[in-house]
Amino acid sequence: MSFYKNKQNHKIAYKSLKGRGLGIIFIHGLNSDMNGAKALTVERYARKNKLNFIRFDCRGHGKSEGKFEEFTISDWKKDLLDIIDNVAKGPQILIGSSMGGWLMMLAAKARPQRIKGMIGLAAAPDFGKDLYNALNKKNKKEVNTKGITKYTSYGFPFYLTKKFFIEAEKNRVLKKQFHYTKPLVLIHGLKDDVVKEDVPRQILKKVTG
């Protein structure tokens, strides 16, 4: 495992393989990390085919520095861009799982010359509003009055902040047409009970180019 120290002196944990051709970067989902089954499956494929590959932990996740509630989608976007700009070499294909699919779209918009393709695995861009609506009355009141609330999803408790929802709104990618001219693959299970099955259709409706 290696670490990249960003401008805030935070360490971002990552693992990489050196190989040939386009690079591949795997981006994990909310409250997941680079050691998830999907990330490791892609890594095995990259190793078998001798491809350049990077998986990393966003801050507040896995082995990277910080507490989850200290960061937002804006920070995790910066983490991905730091990996693209300072760790990865040359053109990249981004593979994003759930929230990682949102981050990959933000990165493709910010670094169009570097990103040559995107693969979304149950990609979940712009989920901030849906997540807020899933909160109960107590959670919503705490977010709006205290700025933070403890939320439990699928038996896993974590903290959500008012800033998290504000930054989520600022970073929406499907609010208007999303100009993108490179290959895009969206893989989504029809029985997914976390990310709605109409999300990939919404993405395709907004992507132009």
Predicted regions and their residues:
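N-terminal cap/lid segment of alpha/beta-hydrolase-fold proteins
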Residues: M1-K18
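Short beta-strand element of the alpha/beta-hydrolase
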Residues: G21-G29
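The serine-hydrolase catalytic nucleophile loop
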Residues: N31-E43, D198
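Conserved alpha/beta-hydrolase
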Residues: A39, E43-E65
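Catalytic nucleophile-loop/oxyanion-hole region of alpha/beta-hydrolase
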Residues: G62-V87
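Alpha/beta-hydrolase fold nucleophile elbow
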Residues: A88-S98
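Short glycine-enriched nucleophile-adjacent loop
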Residues: G101-P112, M118
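The alpha/beta-hydrolase serine catalytic core
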Residues: R114-K206
